[in-house]
């Protein structure tokens, strides 16, 4: 009997930021006899019948850590014992799990794809059996433990869309209003190409992000882009496929070190994507890439896209995502590495 434990922040298919995790959990559940999910909170009925959920939410961090360790210790002492504990995006889970799991022979896997390095991440890397990421450029530390497994996109939820030839071309920038997303660069590029419109869609979850949103809104006014740029709040996870279908191309200037999942999601829908991050050089042709922080380079790529065969580009990108970055291939690799 194959059993796997996954630790994640939240199980909520409607969450605009963490909703994509649910597809990963479902794919893992389809490949094991029992999946145990340790989480702060979970939406009832979101996962299959062979999934057990243990919540460890608490009002204080120390108590939350104690509740997590108690829940994990019970799973490690039960039979059959899990083959591995997968810590999803939060290094602290790997750090807390390792002293309990590894002495019993249970592997600790850390999934992490972000540019931010920290002392906690270094510790988590040291105590984990294996580190998983999209590829070697989406994990900020050098380690021989790193295994590239793709991004894990639920392509079944993102059907290929044949988009009409619309004018003006509508670009989408999707995600949190973080300065790391390069939205200022995108606005300055759009200013240079009057044939396009831009939709910026996403939440502002921190004070810095709320301040940045205000700055972006002011910038739209200063650049006289009110008739071509819309900035709106997040859409629920179930509405994302419709959002992709309503636009013509995604533009992304996320800083190096994190392969933004929205790039792969948009590509899965047969939509052209223009992005700067070098992690996308195995997905995107050179003409769909630009220099990070360079609005002139981005404007040139947008102008090229205006004249390109966007349907053909989209079909090619879709095929690459299905082959290398689907949630099915991601789950296959996790289960294989869990042993």
What do the PLM-derived regions correspond to, one by one?
Residues 234-235, 242-247:
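Short alpha-helical donor nucleotide-sugar binding micro-motif in glycosyltransferases
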Residues 287-296, 302-309:
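Conserved acidic donor-binding segment of nucleotide-sugar-dependent glycosyltransferases
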Residues 40-42, 197-215:
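Glycosyltransferase donor-sugar binding loop
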Residues 54-57, 115-118, 125-160:
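Donor nucleotide-sugar binding/catalytic pocket of nucleotide-sugar-dependent glycosyltransferases
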Residues 19-26, 178-192, 196, 211-212:
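A conserved mid-protein helix/loop that constitutes part of the nucleotide-sugar donor-binding site
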Residues 245-258, 271:
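Acidic donor-binding loop of glycosyltransferase active sites
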Residues 213-234:
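Nucleotide-activated donor-binding/catalytic signature segment of Leloir-type glycosyltransferases, i.e.
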Residues 307-338:
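A charged, aromatic-enriched C-terminal amphipathic alpha-helix characteristic of glycosyltransferases
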């Amino acid at each position: 009997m194959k059993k796997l434990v996954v630790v994640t922040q939240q199980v909520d298919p409607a969450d605009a930021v963490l909703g994509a995790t649910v597809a990963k959990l479902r794919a893992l559940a389809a490949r094991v006899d029992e999946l145990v999910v340790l989480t702060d909170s979970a939406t009832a009925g979101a996962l299959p019948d062979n999934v057990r959920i243990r919540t460890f939410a608490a009002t204080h961090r120390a108590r939350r850590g104690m509740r997590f360790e108690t829940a994990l210790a019970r799973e490690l002492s039960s039979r059959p014992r899990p083959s591995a504990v997968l810590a999803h995006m939060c290094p602290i889970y790997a750090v807390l799990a390792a002293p309990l799991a590894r002495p019993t022979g249970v592997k600790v896997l850390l999934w992490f794809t972000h540019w931010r390095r920290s002392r906690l991440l270094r510790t988590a890397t040291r105590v984990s059996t294996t580190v998983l990421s999209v590829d070697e450029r989406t994990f900020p530390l050098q380690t021989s433990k790193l295994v590239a497994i793709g991004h894990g996109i639920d392509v079944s939820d993102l059907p290929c869309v044949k988009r009409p030839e619309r004018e003006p071309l509508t670009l989408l920038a999707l995600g949190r209003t973080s300065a790391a997303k390069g939205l200022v660069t995108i606005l300055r590029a759009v200013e240079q190409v009057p044939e396009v419109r831009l939709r910026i869609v996403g939440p502002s979850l921190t004070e810095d992000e709320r301040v940045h949103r205000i700055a972006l809104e002011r910038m739209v006014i200063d650049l006289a882009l009110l008739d071509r740029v819309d900035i709106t709040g997040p859409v629920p996870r179930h509405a994302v496929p419709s959002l992709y279908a309503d636009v013509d191309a995604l533009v992304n200037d996320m800083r190096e070190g994190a392969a933004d999942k929205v790039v792969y999601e948009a590509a899965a829908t047969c939509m052209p994507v223009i992005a700067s991050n070098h992690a996308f050089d195995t997905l995107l042709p050179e003409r769909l890439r630009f220099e990070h922080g360079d609005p002139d380079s981005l404007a040139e790529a947008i102008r090229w896209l205006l004249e390109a065969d966007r349907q053909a580009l989209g079909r090619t990108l879709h095929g690459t995502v299905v082959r290398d970055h689907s949630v099915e291939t991601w789950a296959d690799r996790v289960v294989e590495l869990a042993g």
